[in-house]
Amino acid sequence: MRKYFGTDGVRGVANTELTCDLAYKLGRAGGFVLAQGDHRVKVVVGKDTRISGDMLEASLIAGLMSVGCDVITVGIIPTPAVAYLTRKYGADCGVVISASHNPVEYNGIKFFNKNGYKLDDEIELKIEEYIDDIDKIDCLPIGENVGRKLHEHCAQRDYVDYLKSIISTDFKGLKVVLDCANGASYKVAPIVFDELGASVISINSSPDGNNINYKCGSTHPEQLQRAVLEHNADLGLAYDGDADRLIAVNEKGQIVDGDHIMILSALNLKKNNKLAQDTLVVTVMSNIGLTIAAKENGINLSTTAVGDRYVLEDMVKNGYNLGGEQSGHMIFLDYNTTGDGVLSSLILANIILQEKKPLSEIASIMSQYPQVLVNATIKNENKNKYMEYPEIKTEIERIESILDGNGRVLIRPSGTEPLVRVMLEGKEEGQIKELATNLANLIQEKLS
């Protein structure tokens, strides 16, 4: 049973749950496990713009260096950039200090292995063992054997150049609005679009340590919708705090979510004979409309549990090269080993230019069923107990009977917050909203 690592690393409220002491122990235990005693380990460390990032970075690095790891800091940079730079710099591991789309008070620490993939479960469990018994680590290097720290000033440039190498199209004539969520993409995204020739308007690109994800970015695209219309832009692109996800807005100011972007990307790859096994990997949260569009266009779907971790596992295991989530995590495995919001946005812009049609027109290939998501706030320890209550089970069965095969109910505990997410999908939005709200209220009442 995991104690510290969740679905996306170790997360919590910075300085109370994710403390400096825990960050130090994560560095010390992680460095020791990854070293395996046979060579001097090199670790790439990046972060997003949260005020707690510097504090946790200092503690984490102290832990790593205390067991002889050499650390390459790359500063504020998207999570997928750390995955890429870990490979480019020949490091043994990469670490990101970020809580992605979560509010500023949260932070997280996530490890990548030398190939840019998330650590295997067994390694995370081994790290947890040492965290709980830190004195078992009998590694106290002295003198020249203590770890060194080096800051890589070219890290951002290296990532931008790599992204540009993937795109062969000139973006001249394309007007884009970028919502950087006051997060890790605030420099990289505008630079790469500008250097590819696009006309760029950036919003929420002035981080102050406290405004990351605040009423902006991929989880709050309303500001972007207004900006696209105000500037008469061709496209709006919203990232989250660590830029591992993307939500788009078409030229009419309408949201284009991960499902739409995935089906467009899959069709583009298939058209160019580059979609591995003609298969797109999605999660159970993807809209029924995506299933229909895929079937009509000869694209196979492989469906996993919610979480880009499970999408990636399926892709690697079965040799697929495209997968993602409705929330905007999209993995283009030919280019990177994790969700990459900036890469996804470049690929979407490239598709629009290749098709020579507005996004609203090309995205109409998929019709979206109404989908309602309501959160039930509960005690964290009760997240997985909802089916233990007969009243909740009975209400779910009642809703399924009402939908009668023309929709579905999906209940999912959050991997990072004290929430149970209730999702309903069906033909009539008013009906499913009422049903979802009632079910969420019942779950909250029983599990709070």
Swiss-Prot record:
Listed GO CC annotations: cytosol
GO MF annotation: an example: magnesium ion binding
State a single Pfam family of this protein: PGM_PMM_III
Which residues of this protein are catalytic? 100
Q: Name one GO biological process term.
A: carbohydrate metabolic process
Q: Which cofactor does it need?
A: Mg(2+)
The UniProt catalytic activity note for this protein reads: alpha-D-glucosamine 1-phosphate = D-glucosamine 6-phosphate
Its Enzyme Commission number(s) read: 5.4.2.10
Q: Does the keyword NAD apply?
A: no
Q: Which Gene3D superfamilies match?
A: Alpha-D-Glucose-1,6-Bisphosphate, subunit A, domain 3 (3.40.120.10), Alpha-D-phosphohexomutase, C-terminal domain (3.30.310.50)
Cofactor binding note from Swiss-Prot or TrEMBL: Binds 1 Mg(2+) ion per subunit.
User: What's its job?
Assistant: Catalyzes the conversion of glucosamine-6-phosphate to glucosamine-1-phosphate.
Please state what the protein is called.
Phosphoglucosamine mutase
Annotated organism of origin: Clostridioides difficile (strain 630)
Q: Which gene encodes it?
A: glmM
